[in-house]
């Protein structure tokens, strides 16, 4: 079970939002590169970056900070990025800079042809990010709820050749209310590609619950607010996951 620290970038700083609200953010660091190094030193085996401004603007905004992070740690661990990625040129540029995985969310839902083209051009590097509330997919930085069922869309995108799915339960994100295990398992069981859980991770018990269902196809979990507030000790949590899964 991969525990993947999230570094959410807003105006060049590391922040956390509550339920995707750009007006309700807490700054946890002024130096994104130092934050990336901090998580690497704590034992992270992958990093999750989000260009928050980019997600709302529909184009890259925090690219300088992202490039600096890739320069610092991109040769050491895989880095994945979401937010504001709407065209193939942007994907190519980020991959050339050392990014391992591009996360396509809103653009995949609104323009499935773009996702298909991205999978064709950059096979092995495309992850789809599906954000859902009560099983329905949301787009545009979670501001718009669609009528799409998350399982149906994920199966369609699996056929396109995406590398995996990051599933975020919007109702829980940033609330430290616990991962929606049932919904995540339901999605993983419907797919053959890996699912990464996201939204609401609160404590070591969540990690233990996820490890218990890892065999259903859950590859990892995005760690956000809990590792910044101290509710979850990242290094201890990864060690616990490794011990439970026999990786230690």
Swiss-Prot record:
Its EC number is 5.3.1.16. Its main location: cytoplasm. The keyword Isomerase applies. The keyword Metal-binding does not apply. GO terms for biological process: L-histidine biosynthetic process; L-tryptophan biosynthetic process. The active site is at 8 (proton acceptor), 131 (proton donor). Keywords: Amino-acid biosynthesis, Cytoplasm, Histidine biosynthesis, Isomerase. GO terms for cellular component: cytoplasm. It comes from the Bacteria. InterPro entries: Aldolase_TIM (IPR013785), His_biosynth (IPR006062), HisA_bact_arch (IPR006063), Isoase_HisA-like (IPR044524), Isoase_HisA-like_bact (IPR023016), RibuloseP-bd_barrel (IPR011060). Pfam families: His_biosynth (PF00977). Pathway: Amino-acid biosynthesis; L-histidine biosynthesis; L-histidine from 5-phospho-alpha-D-ribose 1-diphosphate: step 4/9. It catalyses: 1-(5-phospho-beta-D-ribosyl)-5-[(5-phospho-beta-D-ribosylamino)methylideneamino]imidazole-4-carboxamide = 5-[(5-phospho-1-deoxy-D-ribulos-1-ylimino)methylamino]-1-(5-phospho-beta-D-ribosyl)imidazole-4-carboxamide. It is an enzyme of class 5 (isomerase). It is found in: Cytoplasm. GO terms for molecular function: 1-(5-phosphoribosyl)-5-[(5-phosphoribosylamino)methylideneamino]imidazole-4-carboxamide isomerase activity. Belongs to the HisA/HisF family. This is 1-(5-phosphoribosyl)-5-[(5-phosphoribosylamino)methylideneamino] imidazole-4-carboxamide isomerase. It comes from Methylibium petroleiphilum (strain ATCC BAA-1232 / LMG 22953 / PM1).
């Amino acid at each position: 079970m991969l525990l993947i620290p999230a570094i959410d970038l807003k105006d060049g700083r590391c922040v956390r939002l509550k339920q995707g609200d750009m007006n309700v953010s807490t700054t946890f660091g002024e130096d994104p590169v130092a934050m990336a190094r901090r998580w690497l030193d704590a034992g992270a085996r992958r990093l999750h970056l989000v260009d928050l401004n980019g997600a709302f603007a529909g184009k890259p905004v925090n690219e300088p900070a992202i490039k600096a992070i890739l320069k610092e740690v991109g040769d050491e661990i895989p880095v994945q990025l979401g937010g504001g990625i709407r065209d193939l040129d942007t994907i190519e540029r980020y991959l050339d800079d050392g990014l391992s995985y591009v996360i396509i969310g809103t653009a995949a839902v609104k323009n499935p042809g773009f996702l298909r083209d991205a999978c064709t051009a950059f096979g092995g590097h495309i992850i789809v990010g599906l954000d859902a509330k009560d099983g329905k997919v949301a787009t545009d930085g979670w501001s718009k709820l669609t009528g799409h069922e998350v399982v149906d869309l994920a199966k369609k995108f699996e056929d396109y050749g995406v590398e995996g799915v990051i599933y975020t339960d919007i109702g829980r994100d940033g609330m430290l209310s616990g991962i929606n295990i049932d919904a995540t398992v339901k999605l993983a069981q419907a797919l053959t590609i890996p699912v990464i859980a996201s939204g609401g991770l609160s404590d070591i018990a969540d990690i233990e619950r996820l490890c218990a269902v890892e065999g259903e196809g859950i590859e990892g979990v995005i760690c956000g607010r809990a590792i910044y507030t101290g509710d979850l000790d990242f290094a201890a949590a990864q060690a616990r996951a490794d011990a439970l899964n026999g990786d230690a």
